[in-house]
A protein has these predicted regions:
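Tryptophan-anchored aromatic micro-motifs
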Residues: 1-4, 145
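Beta-sheet ligand-binding and adhesion/scaffold domains
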Residues: 47-145
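Contiguous, well-ordered beta-strand patches that form the walls/edges
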Residues: 24-62
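N-terminal glycine/threonine-rich, aromatic-flanked beta-hairpin/loop signature
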Residues: 4-38
Length: 145
């Protein structure tokens, strides 16, 4: 689908992410609570529900640099994706109000594979890894790291 995401697993229950392209490009989130489990050698499953009502389930296969994601978007996000393009942490009550106003259905399911293009160890709980929207990053990101 041409979307480009960046995910930082901060610890065993929390992640930060930012979206570089796609219908919600420049959306970014910190301290998203998630279920993170190892399911095989270098294979992890990460799942969460956002304040928007969006459900996300990811499989990260570091050995094969393969990523599979299933995102369940409520209808209101598909109808007005621009409402979610923000630093979500500053707008959680607003996201909840959008979710409650709906509509939730029909749910849009995005189920796709992707290639993992960049991996690095940034340590645990490093708030500097994802600290701005994608459009504020250097042009040569992530090569500049």
């Amino acid at each position: 689908n041409g979307w480009n995401y960046e995910i930082y697993v901060k610890n065993g229950t929390t992640l930060d992410y930012r979206i570089h392209s796609g219908i919600v490009a420049n959306r970014w989130v910190k301290d998203q609570q998630a279920y993170i489990v190892r399911v095989g050698e270098s294979i992890y499953k990460i799942s969460w529900t956002e304040p928007t009502g969006t459900d996300v389930s990811l499989i990260v296969n570091l050995g094969d640099k393969l990523f599979h994601g299933t995102i369940f978007f409520p209808r209101w996000v598909m109808n007005n994706p621009e409402k979610t393009v923000c630093f979500q942490n500053d707008h959680i009550p607003l996201m909840v109000s959008y979710r409650e106003a709906g509509p939730a259905y029909p749910t849009e399911v995005i189920d796709e594979f992707a290639t993992i293009t960049f991996v690095r160890d940034c340590g645990a709980d490093n708030d500097e890894v994802i600290n701005c929207p994608a459009n504020e990053l250097p042009d040569n990101f992530p090569a500049n790291l």
